[in-house]
């Protein structure tokens, strides 16, 4: 239990940041899922569009500290490799 005013404020700040981070992480996962669904359907055009939308969100999540930068780079790299391997 937080006793000092500064500790109480820190708890409030952490709750706000946790909510923001949850939202960003959820949004990132949604966009990545859209890319994976487009890849599964075999639609190269839709997969490319979805990847273009997802990449900035994934990298921004890394920049904000929601995921590690190597994790974000790995996700983008693997998704782009799968998109480019789709038949044209």
Curated annotation (Swiss-Prot):
<dbReference type="Pfam" id="PF01649">
    <property type="entry name" value="Ribosomal_S20p"/>
</dbReference>
<keyword id="KW-0689">Ribosomal protein</keyword>
<comment type="similarity">
    <text>Belongs to the bacterial ribosomal protein bS20 family.</text>
</comment>
<keyword id="KW-0694">RNA-binding</keyword>
<dbReference type="GO" id="GO:0006412">
    <property type="term" value="P:translation"/>
</dbReference>
<dbReference type="GO" id="GO:0005829">
    <property type="term" value="C:cytosol"/>
</dbReference>
<comment type="function">
    <text>Binds directly to 16S ribosomal RNA.</text>
</comment>
<dbReference type="InterPro" id="IPR002583">
    <property type="entry name" value="Ribosomal_bS20"/>
</dbReference>
<dbReference type="GO" id="GO:0003735">
    <property type="term" value="F:structural constituent of ribosome"/>
</dbReference>
<dbReference type="GO" id="GO:0015935">
    <property type="term" value="C:small ribosomal subunit"/>
</dbReference>
<keyword id="KW-0699">rRNA-binding</keyword>
<protein>
    <recommendedName>
        <fullName>Small ribosomal subunit protein bS20</fullName>
    </recommendedName>
</protein>
<dbReference type="InterPro" id="IPR036510">
    <property type="entry name" value="Ribosomal_bS20_sf"/>
</dbReference>
<keyword id="KW-0687">Ribonucleoprotein</keyword>
<dbReference type="GO" id="GO:0070181">
    <property type="term" value="F:small ribosomal subunit rRNA binding"/>
</dbReference>
